């Protein structure tokens, strides 16, 4: 099999979400392409999606060691090692953005990295550039919202994430974050609907279910509140059960539900979700 054919097939499987077949395909041919950074990189992507984070990290590191010139590989592998606080991530992502400034992915990944490292102005500049290149990309709009939020502009963050949700209404993660941002800026009526919608999409996301339960209870949508609570309970680990019980104790009171969501669970969820890398 030729390299180009292999990568085309792998990308096709990835677009279908068939990560296991993608990983098997690339592993099968890895010995034939040991010196091809793209093969290691895309195998890392598949293994990351399968939850094999440590193995994926080694694939990304190998891809970088092979000194790729492809900006897609640089941006993807750089983002992959950034999740492990690897000191090479900044250099690799900066190189990708500098060598291919007209490619939205390179500006997106570098901007996403900078925002989580505390370089908010530089991050927004990169993400503004990415959005100018690809204004209809929901991930770019979302990451621009993250950068604004981490930089303290919560209203601007809510506007950007609203655009992301409009571009991709089925992205449950973005909808939950949008709801949490609406809570921060005092747009409570809109917040409830977004948290419930996001939780319905992300059925196994325990924290999203609990946030939606409190939001629903705060407006006396009791049937929805207890539905979300039971979803959370079904998917909860043992460590989650204390929080599930705490939420349940508040659902009988709209005031107590809103207080827990506004002062405790909501800010904590927003903080942790903003730090999640793409």
Task: Tell where the protein language model's regions lie, with residue ranges.
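Structural signature of tandem alpha-helical TPR/SEL1-like repeats
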Residues: 16-24, 50-62, 81-95, 117-129, ...
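A conserved position within tetratricopeptide repeats
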Residues: 30-31, 64, 97, 131, ...
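Canonical tetratricopeptide repeat
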Residues: 42, 76-77, 109, 143, ...
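TPR/TPR-like (Sel1-like) alpha-helical repeat modules
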Residues: 200-206, 210, 214-240
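Terminal, low-structured helical/coil segments at or just beyond the last alpha-helical repeat
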Residues: 235-278
């Amino acid at each position: 099999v030729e390299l180009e054919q292999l990568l085309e097939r792998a990308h096709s499987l990835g677009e279908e979400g068939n990560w296991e077949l993608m990983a098997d395909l690339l592993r099968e041919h890895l010995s034939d392409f040991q010196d091809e950074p793209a093969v290691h990189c895309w195998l890392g992507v598949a293994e990351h999606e399968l939850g094999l984070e440590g193995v994926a990290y080694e694939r990304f590191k190998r891809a970088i060691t092979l000194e790729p010139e492809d900006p897609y590989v640089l941006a993807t592998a750089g983002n992959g090692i950034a999740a492990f606080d690897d000191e090479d991530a900044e250099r690799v992502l900066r190189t990708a953005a500098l060598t291919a400034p007209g490619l939205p992915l390179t500006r997106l990944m570098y901007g996403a990295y900078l925002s989580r490292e505390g370089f908010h102005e530089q991050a927004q500049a990169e993400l503004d550039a990415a959005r100018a290149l690809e204004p209809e990309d929901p991930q770019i709009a979302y990451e621009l919202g993250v950068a604004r939020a981490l930089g303290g502009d919560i209203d601007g963050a809510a506007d950007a994430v609203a655009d992301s949700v409009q571009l991709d209404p089925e992205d449950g993660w973005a909808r939950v974050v949008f709801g949490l941002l609406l809570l921060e800026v005092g747009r409570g009526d809109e917040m409830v609907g977004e948290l419930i919608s996001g939780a319905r999409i992300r059925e196994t996301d325990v924290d999203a279910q609990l946030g939606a339960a409190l939001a629903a209870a705060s407006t006396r949508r009791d049937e929805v509140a207890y539905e979300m609570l039971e979803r959370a309970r079904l998917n909860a680990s043992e460590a989650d059960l204390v929080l599930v019980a705490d939420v349940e104790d508040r659902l009988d009171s709209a005031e107590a539900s809103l207080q827990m969501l506004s002062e405790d669970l909501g800010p904590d969820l927003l903080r942790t979700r903003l730090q999640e890398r793409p």
